[in-house]
Amino acid sequence: MIITVCKGKIHRAVVTEAELHYEGSLTVDQDLMDMAGMKPYEQVSVVNVNNGARFETYLIVGERGSGTICLNGAAARLGMKGDKVIIITYGQVEEKDLPNDYQPKVVFVDENNRPKKA
């Protein structure tokens, strides 16, 4: 049986921008994407800790080391600058092939979206 598991997560990142009139997506600092094993244009789930909104979009690479977390397009209606969000990617795997000790790549960030630990 194929199951869907959390592949990577950026935990409690702070939204730095919201650009309503931009191509719909989520721009994320490439350093954070790399640490969480996320790829450009990969589908992500975003959970807004402040207002409870949950939505899906795809990733656009942001400048390395910038701390950028930008809600673009319609997603800008679901959050605002300063909101905390959780960004999650998923993968599918045969259940029998998933090791019992499997752990997703999780990146915890500070208030400036700098990694605390991964």
Curated annotation (Swiss-Prot):
The region annotated as signal peptide is: none
Q: Which domain of life is it from?
A: Bacteria
Location comes to: Cytoplasm
Q: Where is the active site?
A: S25 (schiff-base intermediate with substrate), Y58 (proton donor)
Where along this sequence does the record place binding of substrate?
T57, G73, A74, A75
PTM note: Is synthesized initially as an inactive proenzyme, which is activated by self-cleavage at a specific serine bond to produce a beta-subunit with a hydroxyl group at its C-terminus and an alpha-subunit with a pyruvoyl group at its N-terminus.
Q: Which reaction does it catalyse?
A: L-aspartate + H(+) = beta-alanine + CO2
> Entry's Pfam families?
Asp_decarbox (PF02261)
The family database entries (CDD domains) matched by this protein are listed as: Asp_decarbox
| Annotated Gene Ontology cellular component terms | cytosol
Keyword field? Autocatalytic cleavage, Cytoplasm, Decarboxylase, Lyase, Pantothenate biosynthesis, Pyruvate, Schiff base, Zymogen
Q: What InterPro entries is this protein classified in?
A: Asp_de-COase-like_dom_sf, Asp_decarbox
> Which molecular function term from Gene Ontology is one that the record holds?
aspartate 1-decarboxylase activity
Secreted listed as a keyword: no
Q: In terms of one coarse class, where is the protein primarily found?
A: cytoplasm
Q: Name one GO biological process term.
A: alanine biosynthetic process
> Cofactors per UniProt?
pyruvate
Q: How is the cofactor bound?
A: Binds 1 pyruvoyl group covalently per subunit.
The keyword Lyase belongs to this UniProt entry's keyword annotation = yes
Q: In which pathway does it act?
A: Cofactor biosynthesis; (R)-pantothenate biosynthesis; beta-alanine from L-aspartate: step 1/1
- Which EC number(s) are documented for this chain? 4.1.1.11
- What does the function comment of this entry state? Catalyzes the pyruvoyl-dependent decarboxylation of aspartate to produce beta-alanine.
**Would you identify the family this protein belongs to, as annotated?**
Belongs to the PanD family.
Q: How does it assemble?
A: Heterooctamer of four alpha and four beta subunits.
Matching PANTHER family: ASPARTATE 1-DECARBOXYLASE
What protein is this chain from? Aspartate 1-decarboxylase
Q: Which gene encodes it?
A: panD
